[in-house]
Swiss-Prot record:
GO molecular function ontology, one term from the record: structural molecule activity
Subcellular location(s) per record: Periplasm; Bacterial flagellum basal body
Major localization listed first in the record, in broad terms: periplasm
Any GO CC annotation of this UniProt entry: bacterial-type flagellum basal body, distal rod, P ring
Protein name, per record: Flagellar P-ring protein
Keyword Ribonucleoprotein: no
Subunit and partners: The basal body constitutes a major portion of the flagellar organelle and consists of four rings (L,P,S, and M) mounted on a central rod.
Gene name, Swiss-Prot/TrEMBL: flgI
Keyword terms of this UniProt record: Bacterial flagellum, Periplasm, Signal
Length: 348
């Protein structure tokens, strides 16, 4: 039976974090790269003859090696056309390794065990910034409809690309230094201003709005030294609750205290009722699932004690009922849409 893996984040409501954990330095960012390539060596799980662009790509590749083949004569199913994406970090240097994501474009069944051939990765300006090549592994997953393992047509290759071109940077000469909060919040912006001005003993920070803090470097410090000191300062921070669901691996990551409000929803043949009664007990036809949950097998209804209605508990109980990861994802989305989950929901 396919199950969803649940990770709980145990944390206090308010704790100290470094500024670099809650804010980015404006101008210091990743750049997206993309390329088109071929994965070969697949065990009959590649693109079929209906993926004409794959056949044409194979023909073009062979023609570059002085081998002429008509695309219509190619019948191999051991090759798949893929899009390759990567992030080029700020200040990346020639020779640095990048992680890449390889995703099938055609009707391939799996990329497992294949090899990505030399693929140029370009930026938005059309220039080549990295070259990718290497063996593909999808983590040993096999395609299974409706649950974890259904994404063997995409894979991440660690260190699968080499940086060939650097993006020019003038950070050391930049006089306009700005912090941008990852999550807009007036209190956090104000706290950053207060802490930095106290630490440096002068007005080096000014909160402009809920996301922006302008910085003014002291004359006796370089940009690098100044930003290093800025980003390591601690501030009091209350994180925004979030539930993250990895659709590919079937993993739920949630804070231990992410609660679900009283609600009644139905998905396919499963009904979920969050009982506002904190002292609910099992009815005559219900089975006690422990952890405050009761299931009625005749109607496939899951009733949960409001005091125990957290995202983690609901996901765990749905697992016990045999719900697929895709079902659980859909239920979480519906709970969020109904305003019952007091947290941001992110599907990756």
């Amino acid at each position: 039976m396919r199950v969803l893996t649940i990770f709980l984040l145990f944390m206090t409501s308010i704790f100290a974090v470094q500024i670099k954990d809650v804010a980015n330095t404006v101008g210091v960012r990743d750049n997206q790269l993309i390329g088109y390539g071929l994965v070969v060596g697949l065990n009959g799980s590649g693109d079929g003859t209906s993926s004409k662009f794959t056949l044409q790509s194979i023909s073009n590749l062979l023609q570059g090696m002085n081998i002429k083949v008509d695309p219509n004569d190619i019948k191999s199913k051991n090759t798949a056309a893929v899009m390759v994406t990567a992030k080029l970090p700020a200040f990346a240097k020639s020779g640095d390794k990048l992680d890449i994501t390889v995703s099938s474009m055609g009707d391939a069944k799996s990329l497992q065990g294949g090899t990505l051939l030399l693929t140029a990765l370009r930026g938005i300006d059309g220039e080549i910034y990295a070259i990718a090549q290497g063996s593909i592994s999808t983590g040993g997953l096999t395609p299974r409809p409706g649950g974890a393992g259904s994404h063997s047509t995409a894979a991440t290759v660690m260190g699968g690309a080499n940086v060939e071109r650097e993006i020019p940077q003038n950070f050391s000469q930049n006089s306009d230094l700005t912090l941008s909060l990852k999550v807009a919040d007036f209190k956090t912006a104000n706290d950053i201003e207060r802490v930095l001005n106290t630490v440096f003993g002068e007005e080096v920070a000014k909160a402009i709005d809920s996301r922006t803090v302008k910085l003014k470097k002291p004359e006796d410090l370089s940009n690098v030294d100044f930003m290093a000191r800025v980003l390591e300062q601690d501030i009091a921070y209350k994180p925004q609750s979030k539930v993250i669901i990895d659709e590919r691996t079937g993993t739920v990551i949630a804070g231990v205290d992410v609660e679900v409000e009283p609600v009644l929803i139905t998905h396919k043949d499963i009904t979920i009722k969050i009982d506002p009664n904190n002292n609910a007990v099992a009815n005559q036809n219900e089975i006690d699932m422990k952890d405050g949950g009761f299931v009625d097998p005749s109607s496939n209804t899951l009733r949960i004690n409001n005091a125990k209605s957290t995202v983690a508990n609901i996901a765990r109980m749905l697992n016990k009922l045999g719900a697929t990861p895709n079902d659980i994802i859909a239920i979480m989305e519906n709970l969020k849409r109904a305003g019952a989950i007091n947290a941001d929901l992110e599907i990756i």
